[in-house]
Regions:
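Membrane-interface extramembranous regions
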Residues: 1-120
């Protein structure tokens, strides 16, 4: 079970870092609305740029904490529950603008995985 939890933390943490630090300026099939990058995606949701920076900072910080929790278990709950909360927000934004359900699949998957990490 310990190795499974490490794998889940690596998958969630590294995926979030990839989205926000590596692929933020790239188009993906998962972006909200017709957005080609994160800035356009937040505009599609009707959210200001400062909110994008706030959410991005929180997601990156929580992803780093989740990765750190592999070695420091005391930060696991705050990282996993924090990511779950942010992913719930992401899913709700996709629903708000009427995106097809498939666009919210990654956020929903990370929501579920974060809850598994937090609760097991």
């Amino acid at each position: 079970m310990e190795y499974l939890m490490i794998a889940l933390k690596l998958i969630v943490g590294l995926s979030i870092l990839n989205v926000w630090l590596v692929r933020s300026k790239k188009s993906t099939p998962w972006r909200g609305g017709d957005a080609n990058n994160i800035v356009e995606e937040f505009k599609a949701y009707g959210l200001p740029v400062w909110f994008m920076w706030t959410i991005g900072t929180l997601k990156v910080a929580l992803a780093v904490l989740l990765l750190a929790s592999i070695f420091y278990a005391q930060v696991e709950a705050i990282a996993a529950f924090g990511i779950a909360l942010l992913m719930l927000g992401a899913v709700s934004m996709h629903i708000k603008i009427g995106d097809p359900l498939k666009k919210s699949f990654p956020a929903f998957t990370f929501l579920v995985l974060s809850l598994v990490i937090a609760l097991l």
